[in-house]
Structures are given as structure tokens and as C-alpha cells.
Amino acid sequence: MKNIILQYKKKYDAGEPISVVTCYDYTFATLFNRTDVDCLLVGDSLGMVIQGNQSTLPVTLDEIIYHTKAVCKGAPDKTIIADLPFLSYQTSIEEGIRSAGRVLKETNASCVKLEGDSEFIIELTKRMTESGIPVFAHLGLTPQSVHTLGGHRVQGKTEAARNKMIRKSRELAEAGAFALLLEMVPESLGKEITESIRIPTIGIGAGKYTSGQVLVMQDLLGLNEDFHPKFLKKFGNLSGAVKEAVNAYHKEVTKREYPSEAHVFLDT
């Protein structure tokens, strides 16, 4: 497993954009391991795209560990980011460090990702870093706080909100975060934050000036036909390919064309 801090620093220093995609299972991890993508994120977004929930809040630490183990097995050549899910780290510094420690010890992940900018999160970032746990920070739209943010909407649109996010970005970097995810913020704010801190920024709906980009695999592959946010470009249409393949299978089964002689075991 590569060292994610060294990987990100090398690309950041060279001005090379960093590509990240989410992944939740062994099969896709083996495919992504054979691609050029830099890094995989086992996000608590699995609560929505895998479990069918309306938010990320129901995801548990054990579920993150389960999925991260599978991804690490399938993609040994990639660096792996693991989300810490809702209420696995917000209750106390000790609980946060314990949860992060479990993820790193049990999964072989490269780092953990924390959402938020409170004084508690900044202190937790500092304490985790001091404990040898690499921390990936996350600002802007933070899905674990979706109820207090008023839903899934662009953040940092007012001058006060912009200034606060810039300030908190600096504080998180100073606390030891080695990278920062910026989600659903105006492009100009993504650019300003990226230029104001000396760690890589990874954007999702944060414009083209961040140090890299991340997308949910189901979205970029075109597996979710009903999801069309402004920031998303679908780089494939796998939903159509999947339906075509399953319908072809169904047709051959009902016509007794499958299995053919090529797919059965003969007596001789």
C-alpha cells in the first residue's frame, strides 16, 4: 500500500491534478486497481448508493470497516481513504481516535476522512495527527450535517460563509490535515481556498481550480439514471449496458437458447 501523504505531496508539489473515485466492494476495486485513477474513497455515501437510504447518517463504523476491507483487498496498489461515519467520532476525542484506529488497524486503509470545522473537529484533527493517524478534512456541504445545513445545497455563498470557510481551511491545515475535500461550493471559493492553504484540495462540485476531483463511482459510470446534479459529468452509460445484458440473458433463458452446448458439461 502506498503512503497517501507522500503520494499527494508529490503530485501537489508537481502541480499534477489528483483523481479520486469512490468504491465500496471487491469487484469494482479490482477493476479500479487496473486503472490510472490515483486514489479510492470508501465513503459513507454507501448509505445511499449501496443501502438505499435517504442520507449517509445510518451508516455504522462496522459497515465502513466491512466495505473498506473489501476495497483494500481488491486494490492493493491504490491509496484508500475511509470515511468515519456519523457519531463514530463526534462524541469525544477518545472515541474519535478509537474509531480511526479501528479503521486503520482492521482494513489497511491509508487515512480517515472527517467532516466539519468546529473547534472540536480541529482539535480532533490535531490529536489524531499526533497519534499517527493521517486525516483528510472535509468542508462545504458536509452530508453528515445535512439537516443543520438545510439540505443538499451549495455552501459558502455569502461573504461571511466564505470568510469562515477560508479561515477554517487554514485552521484544519495547521492542525495537521494533509488534504481537504471541498464539496458543493462556488468555483471562486474553491480557487481561493486552494490558493490560501499549502495542502491539496479535492473537489466535488467545487470547480476546476482545486488540486483534484472526486466523484461517486455510480454517478460517473452512469449507473444512476435519476441523478443529474450540475457538477456531475457521466463518463459512461453502464445503466444501459447492464439492462441490455440482463435482458439478453432473460431472452435466451426463456427461449432455451442458454445454456447452449458450449456452456454445458458433456458425458464424454
Curated annotation (Swiss-Prot):
Pathway the protein acts in: Cofactor biosynthesis; (R)-pantothenate biosynthesis; (R)-pantoate from 3-methyl-2-oxobutanoate: step 1/2
Q: Which InterPro entries match?
A: Pantoate_hydroxy_MeTrfase, Pyrv/PenolPyrv_kinase-like_dom, Pyrv_kinase-like_dom_sf
Q: Which GO terms describe its biological process?
A: pantothenate biosynthetic process
Specify one Pfam family: Pantoate_transf
**Residues engaged in binding Mg(2+):** 44, 83, 115
Where, by residue number, is the active site?
183
Q: Does the keyword Magnesium feature in the UniProt annotation?
A: yes
| Cofactor-binding details, from the entry | Binds 1 Mg(2+) ion per subunit.
Instruction: Report one GO cellular component.
Output: cytoplasm
Residues that bind 3-methyl-2-oxobutanoate, according to the entry?
44-45, 83, 113
Tell me yes or no: is Membrane among this UniProt entry's keywords.
no
What is this protein's function?
A: Catalyzes the reversible reaction in which hydroxymethyl group from 5,10-methylenetetrahydrofolate is transferred onto alpha-ketoisovalerate to form ketopantoate.
Under the heading HAMAP family, the entry gives: PanB
Question: What family does this belong to?
Answer: Belongs to the PanB family.
Subunit text = Homodecamer; pentamer of dimers.
Q: What is this protein's name? A: 3-methyl-2-oxobutanoate hydroxymethyltransferase
